[in-house]
Amino acid sequence: MQQIHRLERKLLRATAEAIRDFDLVSQGDRIMVAVSGGKDSYTLLHLLMRLRERAPIDFDLVAVNLDQGQPGFPAQVVEDHLRSVGVPYRMLQRDTYSVVRRLVPEGKTTCPVCSRLRRGVLYNAAVEMGCTKIALGHHRDDLVETLLLSALYSGALKSMPPKLRSRDGRNVVVRPLCYAAEEDVAAFAEAMRFPIVPCDLCGSQPNLRRKRVKRLLAELSAEHPAVKGNLLHALAHVVPSHLLDRDLHRQLADATGRDPWLDAEDEEAEDCGEPSAGDGVVSLGGARGGR
């Protein structure tokens, strides 16, 4: 029980800080919490329910689970949990599984197509239900893994934003767990004995690139525990004058009337690839950056 309280406090602090930093929840919001049956979404729902009890503003939560027609999906397990915690909920059924199997060649990962179809269903449901925001359970590790995936395999410096508006302009998506470490989320979900639904019911091949990046981060973290926290910190501390983005450079030059590259400090002599004296666990606001 003591472990549960310790983990809950830690996760509540990280979630509350993200909500404050990025204005993720507003007075009168009706927030759809997408609950897949995994550790992340169960934890997100629990934390938002706890924060709602003590928040200085009023907002509503409604949990939504989508049965995509995957063989053996235990929708009743998820529904029983939602009923037991006393949150308003809605169970959706859309056979996107057969669409995915038709579109994706055998042996290829179905996750990207499946995710897009699922997101579309949730977007439409949110509008129908009058929800002002959709909360997803992506955590810190998802953000830093996506940062490396984008840089290494797509040649772009980008990750998952804490808040975004959908392309059609109808929905706002928020990620309140963006400061929370996956290991804390996993430990909390296990301690709470959430009824976890396996994520491989579809039989899809795993995303090998993401698995490789996750392995790389684990190896680096074993040598330097602050690696993941530092990567998250980097997402919030961009130094445009030390990047090669000409469009960004032009925007800054137009806004300031100065050439950002000529204003850049010469740090090359210090950059030997080794930790500096100040290296270690950094924080993003008040959230710890190490674990």
Curated annotation (Swiss-Prot):
User: Which residue intervals are annotated with compositional bias (Acidic residues) in the record?
Assistant: 262-273
Q: Where are the membrane-spanning stretches?
A: none
GO MF: 4 iron, 4 sulfur cluster binding; ATP binding; metal ion binding; transferase activity; tRNA binding
Q: Which CDD domains match?
A: TtcA-like
Please list the residues that bind [4Fe-4S] cluster: C111, C114, C202
Motif range (PP-loop motif) = 36-41
InterPro entries, per database record: Rossmann-like_a/b/a_fold (IPR014729), TilS/TtcA_N (IPR011063), tRNA_Cyd_32_2_STrfase (IPR012089), tRNA_thiolation_TtcA_Ctu1 (IPR035107)
> Cofactor comment in the record?
Binds 1 [4Fe-4S] cluster per subunit. The cluster is chelated by three Cys residues, the fourth Fe has a free coordination site that may bind a sulfur atom transferred from the persulfide of IscS.
UniProt xrefs under SUPFAM superfamilies:
Adenine nucleotide alpha hydrolases-like
List UniProt keywords, sorted A-Z: 4Fe-4S, ATP-binding, Cytoplasm, Iron, Iron-sulfur, Magnesium, Metal-binding, Nucleotide-binding, RNA-binding, Transferase, tRNA processing, tRNA-binding
Names of required cofactors: Mg(2+); [4Fe-4S] cluster
Q: Does the keyword Ubl conjugation apply?
A: no
Q: What Gene Ontology cellular-component terms does the record carry?
A: cytoplasm
Matches recorded under Pfam families: ATP_bind_3 (PF01171)
Region (Disordered): which ranges?
Answer: 259-291
Q: Where in the cell is it found?
A: Cytoplasm
- Provide the GO biological process annotations: tRNA modification
Please indicate if the UniProt record lists Cell membrane as a keyword.
Answer: no
Catalytic activity, reaction form: cytidine(32) in tRNA + S-sulfanyl-L-cysteinyl-[cysteine desulfurase] + AH2 + ATP = 2-thiocytidine(32) in tRNA + L-cysteinyl-[cysteine desulfurase] + A + AMP + diphosphate + H(+)
Enzyme Commission numbers on file: 2.8.1.-
* Subunit relationships: Homodimer.
Comment field (misc): The thiolation reaction likely consists of two steps: a first activation step by ATP to form an adenylated intermediate of the target base of tRNA, and a second nucleophilic substitution step of the sulfur (S) atom supplied by the hydrosulfide attached to the Fe-S cluster.
Listed HAMAP family: TtcA
Q: What is this protein called?
A: tRNA-cytidine(32) 2-sulfurtransferase
Organism equals Anaeromyxobacter sp. (strain K)
Source lineage: Bacteria, Pseudomonadati, Myxococcota, Myxococcia, Myxococcales
